[in-house]
């Protein structure tokens, strides 16, 4: 049986990587937050395009990771190479589409979330500038996930560290500019302040650095996934159809879930600019601790998938139950830590006191369901998918969101005119119901399938 030491050996670099990625988003929000509520709203809504794209890429790549983890358990390197090639192709196709959309029709995208012309204008400037980063993100994300699925978790973390440093330095320079005082006492502009556009340019350069490190050093160190490009396209009769059968539900799952989360921003945007600014602050701060749960969930997927690939099915069932319980307990503690963070919001975000008050309420409500969110993530991403149970994961993960939570929330805003906290309560019905369904499925053991057989 895999012990806690082995779990955290894999989880810690992933946690670090995910934490730093969240920190970059928070850093963007904090720095742009010095410019005002409109700028926070513009960047937050602009990033909804990336959020939806990210989840589609995550879905396609996660589907491939199911195969790679199980192939890794079998030491089937040809299967690993073939799957990695498909992951790269699909990831590039998705990110290319979103690059074109963000470059050509950014205003149309933003009107889905806000009617404020100032927010739309600044958000469009941000999207046009940040769009080139999507392709580099797609390449590095797919290849880094292939590396992690073969238990090479350190290099992706190092790449993210370097990316964060580049992003932080360029953010400061390009958002605020650089001025020096001349001998006559007048300010001389060395580098112009670009505001939200500067934040986007910094993101582009940081993504380029990340992609270069993930690829170059994998080949230098001769990782299992770092092979000649021709080996990525070795054909095996029936494999592509099997890949599609497993991955399409994951891709649909992540796409619908991402659009649903994005719709939450649209719901609050219809309540006013201050409400959406508060909701963006809540999302940024609560997501800062989420990488710990996500890292443990990703490690669970690797370990459970590898154990299934080794043919140890009973051990995989027991492992899945133990790890879900552990991660839920960790998240319970982390959720409690969100509450004192409400006291430091006024010192971090230079926005109106009403926005801070609303963000604090959002955070306290989020803390109440943090452990449920974590269990749902671990069961869906870490267990059901690694066991090839992607159709049930799809139905559980997005069914309640689209059938219950989103319709209730829209009615609460547009028809019943509920206050912001009551609207959020409608959204938070979802994780409670989802956790009940996930627990029943986990205990049944019906989620376990060896997708590499045959």
Cite the ranges covered by each PLM segment.
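Short alpha-helical transmembrane segments in multi-pass integral membrane proteins
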Residues: 1-14, 68-133, 177, 183-247, ...
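Helix-terminus/linker motif at the lipid-water interface of multi-pass membrane proteins
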Residues: 19, 23-41, 110-117, 173-194, ...
